[in-house]
Amino acid sequence: MDKTDVKLLKLVQDGIPITHSPFKGFASELGISEQEVVDRLKNLQKAGKIRRFAASIGHRAIGITANAMCVWNVPDEQIETVGNIMAEFPEVTHCYERPRYPDWPYNLFTMVHSYTPEDCEKVAVRISEATGIRDYTLFFSEREFKKTGVRL
C-alpha cells in the first residue's frame, strides 16, 4: 500500500458519489486516471484493505430504533462455536470475545438491533436457544453520542 492508496482510502471513506462517473473526482484529486482508481480499489479489496462497497443505511430512519448490547457467559472451550453461531443471526451486527474480570463473568458481547426492545429480547432468547447459553444480560441504549466506522 503506497501513499496514493492511503489518500484514496481517505477519500472513499466518506462515500462514493452516486453519479455517472463516481471515481472522476477522486482521480482528479489524486492526479491519476479513473481506471487507475478502479484498479487500485480492486487491489485494495483483494488485499483485504477494503471489505466491500455498500450503501450505508440509516437504521433509525427506517424504524430500527432499538439496540441492545448482550453480554454472554460462555464456557471458554465453547467460545469459538458459540461466537460463530451468534454471528450468523442477521440482527447481530457485532460479536466480540472480551476478557472476563473477577466481578464480571461475561466474555462474549453482541450488539442486537431491531424495531422494539421486546424484539431485541426475543432475538436474545433465540440466540440462547440456539447456543444453549442461559447466562446473559441485555443493556439497551438510551442515547447515541457517536457512531462511526474507523477513520484514517
From Swiss-Prot:
Has the keyword Lyase been applied to this entry?
A: yes
This enzyme's EC code(s): 4.1.1.111
Q: What does this protein do?
A: Involved in siroheme-dependent heme b biosynthesis. Catalyzes the decarboxylation of siroheme into didecarboxysiroheme.
Activity regulation as described:
Binds heme b. The redox state of the heme b modulates the activity of the enzyme. Activity is stimulated by sodium dithionite.
GO biological process terms on file: heme biosynthetic process
Q: Which reaction does it catalyse?
A: siroheme + 2 H(+) = 12,18-didecarboxysiroheme + 2 CO2
Protein name per UniProt:
Siroheme decarboxylase beta subunit
* Gene designation: ahbB
Q: Cite the SUPFAM superfamilies for this sequence.
A: Winged helix' DNA-binding domain
A GO molecular function term, named singly, is:
lyase activity
From which lineage does this chain's organism come?
Archaea, Methanobacteriati, Methanobacteriota, Stenosarchaea group, Methanomicrobia
Q: Which InterPro entries match?
A: AhbB-like, AsnC_trans_reg2, HTH-Siroheme_Decarb, NirdL-like_HTH, Tscrpt_reg_AsnC-like, WH_DNA-bd_sf
| Organism (species) | Methanosarcina barkeri (strain Fusaro / DSM 804)
In which domain of life is the source organism classified?
Answer: Archaea
Record bears the keyword Nuclease:
no
Alphabetically ordered keywords of this record: Heme biosynthesis, Lyase
Membrane-spanning segments: none
Query: Which Gene3D superfamilies does the record associate with it?
Result: 3.30.70.3460
The family classification in the record reads:
Belongs to the Ahb/Nir family.
Q: What class of enzyme is it?
A: lyase
The pathway entry for this protein reads as: Porphyrin-containing compound metabolism; protoheme biosynthesis
Assembly information from the UniProt record: Forms a heterodimer composed of AhbA and AhbB.
